[in-house]
Amino acid sequence: MSKVTGSERVKRGMAEMQKGGVIMDVVNAEQAKIAEEAGAVAVMALERVPSDIRAAGGVARMANPKIVEEVMNAVSIPVMAKGRIGHITEARVLESMGVDYIDESEVLTPADEEYHLRKDTFTVPFVCGCRNLGEAARRIGEGAAMLRTKGEPGTGNIVEAVRHMRQVNSEVSRLTVMNDDEIMTEAKNIGAPYEVLKNIKENGKLPVVNFAAGGVATPQDAALMMELGADGVFVGSGIFKSEDPEKFAKAIVQATTHYQDYELIGRLAKELGIAMKGLDINDLSLEERMQERGW
């Protein structure tokens, strides 16, 4: 019996519905409810937020299915869950549980150092990280319905997310003025599917939404990423590692929606406590940088 797969149009359409919103990492039902009440458009169920994964070291795997199930039962908004890069069985288990999206995530320890998942063989849509157009196009070619910047998870430092968003956007702009021969050469140079690049050139944009992720810690960070062209924002450790998660969650949602209302963002920031402790990217070795995982 052949596997049933979801159509590309339906998967991408589901992701489009999250545009302009905030997706929050949660580790239990209580946090999921806080996220929903704050206005999150979806939650990401995982065992530990990225900052705790970074601190603990070792191997980071898919969350216990019990945690994912508790979160799914607690909220009415879509629930995402992370699986390891290339781990077919983790993804199939999450799909069988009925999660709304799977994040093939570099936050977890990769299971396969050669292959990402063939996401077009699944019914459930996938979100994947990217730092540049080559990574974005490869993930789209594999069937990703949604992209996000990799940033540097668990640091509370927005600099890498900014770098990745600007990089992808500038490469998309450059692609739009290329002729077919140049696109073929570009596909070879960056290891990207030609048809995906051709589609981007013809439409002047990526065929899927691209959210900001990795290092968002304040309402100002979220608004900045929207200014730079993000379709929405993922917040990992930034909310539940802050002094007042409920206030931070609501403020980040409002700042994402009203990202050019600087007076509002200033008022929101005044009412908040202390943000999560940040890490300087320069203090991390290449081996410690989660963004280096995947290819």
Curated annotation (Swiss-Prot):
Record function comment: Catalyzes the formation of pyridoxal 5'-phosphate from ribose 5-phosphate (RBP), glyceraldehyde 3-phosphate (G3P) and ammonia. The ammonia is provided by the PdxT subunit. Can also use ribulose 5-phosphate and dihydroxyacetone phosphate as substrates, resulting from enzyme-catalyzed isomerization of RBP and G3P, respectively.
Family per record: Belongs to the PdxS/SNZ family.
Catalysed reactions listed for this entry: aldehydo-D-ribose 5-phosphate + D-glyceraldehyde 3-phosphate + L-glutamine = pyridoxal 5'-phosphate + L-glutamate + phosphate + 3 H2O + H(+)
Binding site for D-ribose 5-phosphate: D25, G154, G215, G236, S237
MF term (GO), any: pyridoxal 5'-phosphate synthase (glutamine hydrolysing) activity
EC numbers on record: 4.3.3.6
Annotated binding of D-glyceraldehyde 3-phosphate, by residue: R166
Protein name: Pyridoxal 5'-phosphate synthase subunit PdxS
Record's subunit section: In the presence of PdxT, forms a dodecamer of heterodimers.
PANTHER family with a match to the protein in the record: PYRIDOXAL 5'-PHOSPHATE SYNTHASE SUBUNIT SNZ1-RELATED
InterPro entries per record: Aldolase_TIM (IPR013785), PdxS/SNZ (IPR001852), PdxS/SNZ_N (IPR033755), RibuloseP-bd_barrel (IPR011060)
Pfam family for this entry, one: SOR_SNZ
Catalytic machinery residues: K82
PROSITE patterns in the cross-refs: PDXS_SNZ_1, PDXS_SNZ_2
Keyword terms: Lyase, Pyridoxal phosphate, Schiff base
Pathway: Cofactor biosynthesis; pyridoxal 5'-phosphate biosynthesis
Top-rank EC class of the record's enzyme: lyase
Gene Ontology annotations of biological process type: amino acid metabolic process; pyridoxal phosphate biosynthetic process; pyridoxine biosynthetic process
Gene name of the encoded protein: pdxS
Record keyword Lyase present: yes
NCBIfam families: PRK04180.1, pyridoxal 5'-phosphate synthase lyase subunit PdxS
Recorded superkingdom: Bacteria
